[in-house]
């Protein structure tokens, strides 16, 4: 078999000619593709083109694999698969021998479809491309037992409910604003949704950022969390944007610091790797921050409130394992240190503070196969969350504005493979809510969605009112009114 090298090259794969339906599995030798440069050279721009069509009977999902080699860059090289002009990028790791690379699961529409492989940021060698009918896991087999063997009955009951709807429906959610935003009106986003759709989201997102050793104050997030669960029958989730002083070198643990001199970004002089090293100032601060958080989580536990807890989120940031792409301080020392910090927090809260009302949700990305290195492990994680922000960047349709109804199905299934279908996968944060038709047709079984507050839910450039009405009033979407918890009390 001869290979070809896809540089910045347009390669359209011939699934079938004319009007006949394509038979799957379908494999094509790369060198047999019309218009391909047979020599091992790179081709720039869209100089070489070939247009071919394939025909399928109905909308559906298909698996794409290619036999590839990549010797350009040991850090990996981006390759793009384009389905009917919609681009999806994958980082192909360095391999100097042929390997079978998973280009993900993608949707083909009823009728003719065009498939393109192109190396926008470099090239790889291709030998064969294989397309097969997609197969889907049995979502009902996801484990329902929590990682914490002492989990409260409320947490276990919530986990069992989540597992019972996983893969069948999607649960609606909405993040509340934190601090004193919206002039103190924490109901703004929720009233907006209800006034528009007649429904309330089932999940309410909170953040414990303001319970911190620096400028901490009680914004009553804990009280609202208890009210949402115990009085309104909802589900609560919470993140934790824990701040550190920007000038940590000159900070004395216990001192108050103006919020403008604090950050959760990577710009602080706080040495992340020391957070778990006993005897360091960073560790002393980290322990104090955990103690203050634990006080609030204990109040929830005492009120019999289970919580989907999502701390230390978005750690990888942009694709990396060494912390070079991190957005937050907890990720800037790299994947290995981050996993240790996660486990440290888990052990502190469950063992030292005896907190067992938590369903632990860890944010992961799917930039490359290396993204799995950020995973803390099955014994420390109950659920995986993905944060989707792609109305401007990382779109597949070439647009740079407006709602993006893409279900991000390839990412869902990549994350599912990371955890071997042992954990539920959720859209922990998002801008546009995926289109309900896309979710159903593509089997993108996200457990829940949860738009961020403010413009992400209120403005049409992120979520069109018509789209919100459609999904909130579709039987596939679970709203507050559908939850069984209040009825059972």
Located regions from the model:
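Substrate-binding cleft of extracellular glycoside hydrolase catalytic domains
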Residues: 214, 222-344, 351, 355
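Aromatic-lined carbohydrate-recognition surfaces of secreted/lumenal glycan-active proteins
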Residues: 174-175, 310-312, 342, 346-370, ...
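Substrate-binding cleft of secreted/luminal carbohydrate-active enzymes
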Residues: 175, 423-489
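Alpha-helical scaffolding within the catalytic cores
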Residues: 184-193, 220-223, 295, 364-376, ...
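Extracytoplasmic
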Residues: 19-156
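N-terminal module-boundary/linker segments of secreted carbohydrate-active enzymes
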Residues: 132-206
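Active-site clefts of carbohydrate-active enzymes
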Residues: 388, 392, 396-397, 412-440
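Aromatic- and acid-rich polysaccharide-binding/catalytic face
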Residues: 371-400, 450-453
């Amino acid at each position: 078999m001869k290979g070809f090298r896809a540089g910045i090259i347009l390669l359209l794969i011939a699934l079938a000619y004319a009007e006949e339906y394509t038979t799957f599995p379908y494999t094509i030798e790369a060198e047999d593709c019309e218009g391909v440069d047979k020599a091992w050279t790179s081709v720039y721009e869209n100089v070489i083109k070939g247009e071919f069509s394939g025909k399928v009977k109905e909308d559906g999902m298909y698996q794409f694999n290619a036999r590839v080699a990549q010797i350009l860059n040991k850090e990996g090289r981006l390759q793009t698969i384009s389905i009917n002009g919609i681009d999806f990028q994958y980082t192909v790791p360095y391999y100097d021998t042929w390997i079978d690379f998973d280009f993900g699961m993608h949707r083909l529409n009823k009728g003719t479809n065009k498939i393109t492989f192109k190396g926008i940021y470099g090239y790889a060698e291709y030998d064969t491309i294989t397309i097969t009918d997609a197969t889907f896991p049995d979502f009902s087999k996801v484990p329902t037992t929590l990682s914490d063997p002492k989990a409260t009955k409320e947490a276990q009951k919530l986990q069992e409910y989540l597992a019972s709807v996983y893969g069948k429906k999607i649960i609606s959610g909405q993040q509340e604003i934190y601090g004193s935003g919206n002039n103190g009106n924490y109901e703004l986003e929720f009233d907006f949704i209800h006034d528009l759709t007649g429904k309330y989201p089932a999940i309410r997102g909170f953040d414990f950022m303001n319970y911190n050793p620096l400028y901490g104050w009680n914004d009553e997030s804990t009280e609202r969390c208890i009210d949402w669960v115990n009085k309104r029958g909802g589900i609560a989730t919470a993140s934790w944007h824990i701040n550190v002083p920007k000038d940590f070198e000159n900070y004395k643990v216990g001192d108050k610091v103006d919020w403008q001199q604090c950050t959760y970004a990577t710009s602080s002089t706080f040495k992340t790797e020391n957070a778990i090293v006993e005897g360091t100032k960073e560790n002393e601060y980290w322990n104090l921050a955990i103690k203050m958080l634990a006080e609030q989580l204990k109040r929830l536990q005492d009120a019999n409130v289970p919580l989907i807890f999502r701390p230390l989120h978005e750690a990888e940031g942009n694709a990396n394992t060494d912390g070079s792409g991190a957005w937050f301080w907890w990720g800037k020392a790299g994947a290995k240190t981050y996993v240790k910090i996660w486990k440290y927090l888990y052990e502190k809260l469950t063992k030292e503070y005896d907190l067992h009302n938590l369903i632990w949700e860890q944010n992961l990305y799917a930039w490359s196969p290396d993204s799995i290195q950020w995973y803390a492990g099955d014994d420390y994680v109950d659920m995986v969350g993905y944060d989707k922000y792609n109305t401007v960047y990382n779109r597949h349709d070439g647009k740079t504005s407006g709602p993006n109804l893409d279900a991000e199905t390839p990412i869902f299934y990549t994350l599912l493979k990371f955890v071997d279908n042992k954990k539920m996968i959720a859209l922990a944060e998002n801008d546009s809510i995926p289109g309900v038709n896309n979710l159903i047709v593509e089997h993108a079984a996200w457990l829940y969605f949860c738009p961020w507050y403010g413009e992400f839910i209120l403005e049409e450039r992120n979520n069109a009112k018509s789209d919100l009405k459609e999904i909130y009033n579709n039987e596939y979407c679970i709203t507050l009114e559908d939850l069984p918890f209040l009825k059972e009390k």
